Amino acid sequence: MGQEKHVFSIDWAGRKLTVETGQLAKQANGAVMVRYGDTAVLSTATASKEPKTVDFFPLTVNYEERLYAVGKIPGGFIKREGRPSEKAILASRLIDRPIRPLFADGFRNEVQVVSIVMSVDQDCSSEMAAMFGSSLALCVSDIPFEGPIAGVTVGRVDNKFIINPTLEQLEKSDIHLVVAGTKDAINMVEAGADEVPEEIMLEAIMFGHEEIKRLIAFQEEIVAAVGKEKSEITLYEIDSDLKEKVRGMAESNLLKAIQVHEKHAREDAISEVKNEVLAKFEEEEHDEETLKQVKDILSQLVKNEVRRLITEEKVRPDGRAVDEIRPLSSEVGLLPRTHGSGLFTRGQTQALSICTLGALGDVQILDGLGVEESKRFMHHYNFPQFSVGETGPMRGPGRREIGHGALGERALEPIVPSEKDFPYTIRLVSEVLESNGSTSQASICASTLAMMDAGVPIKAPVAGIAMGLVKSGDNYTVLTDIQGMEDHLGDMDFKVAGTSKGVTALQMDIKIEGLSREILEEALQQAKKGRMEILESMLSTLAESRKELSPYAPKILTMSINPDKIRDVIGPSGKQINKIIEDTGVKIDIEQDGTIFISSTDESMNQKAKKIIEDLVREVEVGQLYLGKVKRIEKFGAFVELFSGKDGLVHISELALERVGKVEDVVKIGDELLVKVTEIDKQGRVNLSRKAVLREQKEKEEQKS
């Protein structure tokens, strides 16, 4: 590439896309600065010189956020960026998924792709710029890579598709789709939607692919100008004679073992065959490298046989038809003290979801590069090792768990009631208790049931299903409800969630170079059929959301005040609102428009807090009568509390019809007085009169007589 700076530009969805090479990060194998509008992302690709002694492709993709990109200084004492945000982790996964299938089988050199977000224009996606830059950094480098790929965001406003919609357009859009692929095929889809029909989702994907082709042509132009010659990489290969020997020893027995229907029995049967073959090689005293290759050959034989049975004989490992769903069952209300719970079981995959309702003050505060500051609906996914019958450390959530949690959140968010209709913060936690594939989709089903059990008035129930694919040449088979082995050995994991009306979320990962429209269409239609079957099973357990909330859930009372009165409720340094909270034990959340949410498990305390607030914001009206209480006595008169927080002065001359020499001769502290408001002066001071009330009473009595 040399040291000379090169600049390339095109128009991308009405904004300028500029690529700079040759100036920054020149010691990386490949580096590009991508500028999209005012968004700037530096993407680099680096590879180790020698292959690693591992049995997988060691690729790492990092999307690094820097708060200086939006003019922020990190909070806390350290003032540095800490662990990656959830958004950064999801963006890293988004970039990883379309580039991973485009490295050769047997690639064992470590590859690291890093994108640092240096400037953010909120209307020009930094994730899409980073995906473009990651592909291009690999393509201009000397690292063997079968790209390029590109990705775009697709929205739909007023039934028209939009490439890379602005934030304002996304607010109105019923689709938020990210699609990536090569110039020939699609290899990654990630989407959220408002119950959009499958046909429209497919059109959106294909619409995005047309723009991808243009971006790839732009990358190819840049590579032709500044790309490095690709280096020779030693790929991991297995000796062909050894392969034939192992096949002869194991193939027939593996065929029988693979077709054992129950997961653990099948795994044990396969392990037994593998161990017998390995034992024979160990007797012959082969070296470690040979034994490692024997293990790899055995794993490949299992993979090949599973794939052959599915494509040629339409036989799945557990004996199901290609479009058959595993046995379904569900249950609600398992945990008495939680606000709602749902258990969903599909074959040997089981998820228990718990719904917790909180006040609006319990929202998650977000501190990142986006404009969104808080989140009132959350879905968290946990995958403990016991769910697959294994041991392991209990750590915090990893990338996979965060990704699955976000997918469930995206699938369920469209059916969550608005803050106006249901002023609660909602947190769902899905605990995977058993795993044999499709756990993320089981968590969506369980979470729907948990919300219904909690009494959340959802717009419609959502179910999810994972579709698979086994493709050999032009022959392919689409599988409904894939289990773990089919996910591991197949070519696609296509997760589809939605209601009876349409799709709310999609996620597609593939291990081959890409998929045609025909396969996508078949997978979506087969998924719809499966989703309807699952929804029917779920609704037989609980047909609709419960009418009452759990007695342990907070009760929320909503009231509105004049926004100008908010300061009276809060008081100086929060003194007033803190006193209300201390006296009643409630939580209080105040919106800028004067809407106040009061929450507590005790409804009487909500009402008490409401009464205090009403008194604080109540307006004193001139000419009105009030029954007040004497709070303070001075030589010049008595101060009377009309209601909480509102005092007025009855001057000594206004205490009685006759002349009063001493205030204490007429009233004492604690006395109740009926008084009339005669004036509110420019400083807001309230002047009261008892004399005026007595005069009116006297006149009425005289009229009667």
Swiss-Prot record:
Its EC number is 2.7.7.8. Mg(2+) binds at D487, D493. It is an enzyme of class 2 (transferase). Its cofactor is Mg(2+). SUPFAM superfamilies: Eukaryotic type KH-domain (KH-domain type I), Nucleic acid-binding proteins, Ribonuclease PH domain 2-like, Ribosomal protein S5 domain 2-like. It comes from the Bacteria. GO terms for cellular component: cytosol. Keywords: Cytoplasm, Magnesium, Metal-binding, Nucleotidyltransferase, RNA-binding, Transferase. This is Polyribonucleotide nucleotidyltransferase. The lineage of its organism: Bacteria, Bacillati, Bacillota, Bacilli, Bacillales. The gene is pnp.
